């Protein structure tokens, strides 16, 4: 068997997430249906680096899969790209070592989160940015987000009921920028891994701090206590993008 790695992007609006689930449309299912056709009716399972939730988008999701024969890489990419639905794009395909694993190989992920501060909101971006029609002190958000950098136990920023035991993660980049032209806030987080709904919970908390309904040092309290109830609400999924995955050499 030959192992292939692919970089894909997708519009998450009409997907119930990346991972295959019964009776709903998922990214994994659509790509596996295409690979079934390209592999003469033989089933092919794909493995993704990140399991994005319903409504979450991706610029640079990474998958791997095995095929029984060597393929021309561009023809394989083209076949996948043209035979998957229009809301999936296959950007690149390459052959990798047999032991490469998209999820378990050591890597860093970068997520981006777009917040539309417009009043009224931009209707053309309703599926691609989370609307927050309240005042936000940008300087306060900028100060608060710095507290998330470094290695911490992020228990207070994950969804309750998660089965992951070790909730210590390292965030190497946590920034926020303001696009004065669009009125959007652009949050960027890079880390060694993220817990379930962690990014959305961090953004929801930062927006509440920026709106003056939480103090900046609330971040410290959440990190120290691990108490989810101290954090802000979970931001909607439509503003979240899996931007890039970089593997260690």
Curated annotation (Swiss-Prot):
InterPro entries: PsdUridine_synth_cat_dom_sf, PsdUridine_synth_TruA, PsdUridine_synth_TruA_a/b_dom, PsdUridine_synth_TruA_C, TruA/RsuA/RluB/E/F_N. GO terms for biological process: tRNA pseudouridine synthesis. It catalyses: uridine(38/39/40) in tRNA = pseudouridine(38/39/40) in tRNA. Its EC number is 5.4.99.12. The keyword tRNA processing applies. Belongs to the tRNA pseudouridine synthase TruA family. Homodimer. This is tRNA pseudouridine synthase A. It comes from Streptococcus mutans serotype c (strain ATCC 700610 / UA159).
């Amino acid at each position: 068997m030959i192992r292939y790695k692919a970089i894909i992007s997708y519009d998450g609006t009409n997907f119930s997430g990346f991972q295959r689930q019964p009776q709903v449309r998922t990214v994994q299912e659509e790509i596996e249906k295409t690979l079934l056709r390209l592999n003469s009716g033989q089933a092919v399972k794909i493995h993704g680096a990140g399991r994005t939730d319903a409504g979450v988008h991706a610029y640079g999701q990474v998958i791997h899969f095995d095929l029984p024969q060597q393929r021309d890489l561009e023809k394989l990419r083209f076949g996948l790209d043209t035979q998957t639905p229009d809301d999936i794009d296959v950007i690149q395909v390459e052959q990798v070592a047999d032991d490469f694993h998209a999820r378990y190989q050591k890597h860093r992920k970068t997520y981006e989160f777009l917040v539309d501060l417009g009043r009224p909101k931009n209707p053309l971006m309703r599926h691609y940015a989370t609307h927050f029609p309240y005042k936000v002190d940008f300087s306060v958000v900028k100060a608060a987000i710095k507290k998330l950098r470094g290695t911490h136990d992020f228990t207070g920023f994950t969804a309750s009921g998660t089965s992951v035991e070790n909730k210590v993660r390292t965030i190497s980049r946590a920034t926020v920028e303001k696009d004065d032209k669009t009125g959007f806030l652009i949050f960027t987080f890079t880390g060694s891994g993220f817990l379930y709904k962690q990014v959305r919970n961090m953004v929801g908390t930062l927006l509440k701090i920026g709106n003056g309904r939480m103090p900046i040092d609330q971040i410290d309290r959440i990190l120290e206590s691990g108490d989810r109830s101290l954090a802000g609400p979970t931001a909607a999924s439509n503003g979240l993008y899996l931007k890039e995955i970089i593997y260690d050499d």
